[in-house]
């Protein structure tokens, strides 16, 4: 009888452990889903804000350079209004694929909201940041969108280097102001904060 009870306990323990394991996997999957944008697969704004705070702490500790690059698709409302939201999604996905691919060795790409995206660069010098940003911008401008039967959708970018002691909000605002300057200067360009 004792052997039977032991076998029964082992069987239930195994089932319980499998259930806990399955629950943990589901929980981790849900946590990942909460951190990613469902359309693009990029990390979302919440993830960006958390990563930005961590980057500031790391940069303050190590003295390494860090940059924010904010991208915005130029005249995106016109794309949605003229070609429909599903084609607008095609445009967003195309840019996100480029952002993810070009930034993978230097930082992380995020969807900040709507047609606005961010790359958070770590331990990198400005010339390399500019190369990555300009590669994305140029490739996006030349990308052929079949639904339009041409290319020519552009994006603008604002870049800011982290300054020692700066808050996350101040750092982001400097990059955002640079983006605004790029838009004001005619779009399809990059402006670096001074």
Locations of the language-model features?
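Signal-transducing coiled-coil linker helices
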Residues: 2-38, 47-57, 107-108, 120
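Conserved nucleotide-binding and Mg2+-coordinating catalytic segments in signaling enzymes
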Residues: 30-50, 71-85, 93
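Heptad-repeat coiled-coil signal-transmission/dimerization helices
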Residues: 48, 52, 91-92, 96-99, ...
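Active-site-proximal structural segments of metal-dependent nucleotidyl cyclase/transferase enzymes
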Residues: 51-83, 99, 110
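Active-site-proximal alpha-helical element of nucleotidyl cyclase-like catalytic domains
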Residues: 87-108, 116
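Alpha-helical scaffold within the catalytic cores of cyclic-nucleotide enzymes
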Residues: 96-97, 128-146, 176
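A short pre-motif secondary-structure segment
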Residues: 108-111, 151
